[in-house]
Amino acid sequence: MRSDTIKTGFEKAPHRSLLKATGSIVSNNDFKKPFIGICNSYNELIPGHSHLQELGRIAKEEVRKAGGVPFEFNTIGVCDGIAMGHIGMRYSLASRELIADSVETVAQAHCLDGLVCIPNCDKITPGMMMAALRINIPVIFVSGGPMKAGHTPSGQTVDLISVFEAVGQFSAGKIGNEELESIEESACPGCGSCSGMFTANSMNCLSEALGFALPGNGTILAIDPRRNELVREASRRIIDLVKKDIKPRDILSRNALLNAFALDFAMGGSTNTILHTLAIANEAELDFNFSELNALSAKTPYICKVSPATMAVHIEDVDRAGGVSAILHELSRIDGLLDLSTLTVTGKTLGENIADAEILDYTVIRSIDEPYSATGGLAVLFGNLAPQGAVVKTGAVAPEMMKHTGPAKIYDCQDDAIKGIMGDDVKAGDVVVIRYEGPKGGPGMPEMLSPTSAIMGRGLGESVALITDGRFSGGSRGACIGHISPEAAERGPIAALHNGDLITIDIPSRSISVNLTEETINERLAALKPFEPKIKKGYLARYAQMVTSANTGAILKNPVSCEPK
């Protein structure tokens, strides 16, 4: 066992003495058992994590019963909703790398034999996955589960996005203070990751398709007793994974990655999933190109429409309709779309995991014969405005905006854009451009939920597009094109735009362009002053110097590799 490094032999007497002092060693016999890290992300600041302390307790109890010795440790976490619209959002994506590094540090420093990872919200799940693939020891994921959707006293179904959009409605005089307060009080009724197909739930659903989590992980509610049972089962499974030495890189093959993207496209997941999955692929040393996604999307039907694409369906409804397994089982009817032979943490293949799954409500999960659209709910756009690509959640775009040409309305930061939208500076037909908000320029590639919600709340969602080198919340809806690469801070073409330039978005053709010649773009870029970093000290300053483009997953540069060739 790896842990023998810190517990076996006379020379390790000091190590054993310290381990006994933790209280986790019940008897000397424990030194013969595998040491299992319970990697928790309990945090009283995040509603999706406020209940995880109890899940950690359950995990430790079950690991010990199954023959292991549990050691719980915590990671940091950021609530994207609370961090939205201020300096905090610049730390959100950057926190993913801190989480990955911290999990790596604890697991390697203490020679743990395996990990039970308990994440839930946006950056915590991918951060832990990146670490798992980097250190490559047996790991199983079991998330905290989604939040229930809310209901106002009048019976309206609401979620967090309803509150953001209500702010826009209130500022436009469309609703009063009483209605705003009613939505605020009702939207988030308890613990769990926000209730739609936002980034947290998207990643937790993808965990099943990747093979890292048990069936049900993505959809069983946080408050459902089955969630505790899932934790128990996962905590028992880790001991078997350690005994059989089944590691993350045994599970995450290129085809497992494609399975996850197929699920993502079928559910219209958050655009952030592309960013995170590319980063995960990098840690697994899988050769995967951003441009390959359109071909997969073209053969993946969009069969499960969930909030924010529709307020009629939330994750609890997907669970009731059969969950991720039912969606994957339905997709498996398409010849060659899924690789059902990929290994999972159950010890079985993906095909075996989903063999008995069935759709229980066709109004929630549609048949592949009657999809919402024949192609997936996410797409990658290319053109002279995004030579390295941009991402759009097609499933949340109004039909009227699938093709749009309009004049650019330029803002060099999100705050200015929000003021412009709220101040009636943006008119029907415009293309709002928010730039210098990429991984380097932001820094941290902040989400644009506040401006997109303001556009929707002010009734402009079917006439205004928004493009950015930043990113979007999984809750954003409308013609929102993000991750434009190269970013403005790297002198990408988006930095050459002037107010009034005509921008054409053609989602069916997967293109985004500006009506400028290459010569004009290059002349404008050459005339720009060097980019001046916005933050010059602390973690974000270091992050901005090391982060790469969105089309590579916004991973950090590794200037020196000590890995053997």
Curated annotation (Swiss-Prot):
Required cofactor(s): [2Fe-2S] cluster; Mg(2+)
Record-linked Pfam families: ILV_EDD_C, ILVD_EDD_N
GO cellular component, one term: cytosol
Classification via PROSITE patterns: ILVD_EDD_1, ILVD_EDD_2
Domain of life: Bacteria
Entry annotated with the keyword Magnesium: yes
In-chain residues carrying the UniProt-annotated modification N6-carboxylysine: 123
EC number per UniProt: 4.2.1.9
Active site residues per record: 473 (proton acceptor)
InterPro entries cross-referenced by the UniProt entry: Dihydro-acid_dehy_C (IPR042096), DihydroxyA_deHydtase (IPR004404), DiOHA_6PGluconate_deHydtase_CS (IPR020558), ILV_EDD_C (IPR056740), ILV_EDD_N (IPR000581), IlvD/EDD_N (IPR037237)
Pathway per the UniProt entry: Amino-acid biosynthesis; L-isoleucine biosynthesis; L-isoleucine from 2-oxobutanoate: step 3/4; Amino-acid biosynthesis; L-valine biosynthesis; L-valine from pyruvate: step 3/4
Residues bound to Mg(2+): 80, 122-123, 447
Gene Ontology annotations of biological process type: isoleucine biosynthetic process; L-valine biosynthetic process
Catalytic activity: (2R)-2,3-dihydroxy-3-methylbutanoate = 3-methyl-2-oxobutanoate + H2O; (2R,3R)-2,3-dihydroxy-3-methylpentanoate = (S)-3-methyl-2-oxopentanoate + H2O
Cofactor mode of binding and number, as noted: Binds 1 [2Fe-2S] cluster per subunit. This cluster acts as a Lewis acid cofactor.
This protein's record includes keyword DNA repair: no
Residue runs in coiled coils: none
Keywords: 2Fe-2S, Amino-acid biosynthesis, Branched-chain amino acid biosynthesis, Iron, Iron-sulfur, Lyase, Magnesium, Metal-binding
Binding site for [2Fe-2S] cluster: 121, 194
Root EC class: lyase
Molecular function per GO: 2 iron, 2 sulfur cluster binding; dihydroxy-acid dehydratase activity; magnesium ion binding
Assembly and interaction partners: Homodimer.
PANTHER family: D-XYLONATE DEHYDRATASE (PTHR43661), D-XYLONATE DEHYDRATASE YAGF-RELATED (PTHR43661:SF3)
Stated family: Belongs to the IlvD/Edd family.
Physiological role: Functions in the biosynthesis of branched-chain amino acids. Catalyzes the dehydration of (2R,3R)-2,3-dihydroxy-3-methylpentanoate (2,3-dihydroxy-3-methylvalerate) into 2-oxo-3-methylpentanoate (2-oxo-3-methylvalerate) and of (2R)-2,3-dihydroxy-3-methylbutanoate (2,3-dihydroxyisovalerate) into 2-oxo-3-methylbutanoate (2-oxoisovalerate), the penultimate precursor to L-isoleucine and L-valine, respectively.
This protein's name: Dihydroxy-acid dehydratase
Species whose genome carries this gene: Pelodictyon phaeoclathratiforme (strain DSM 5477 / BU-1)
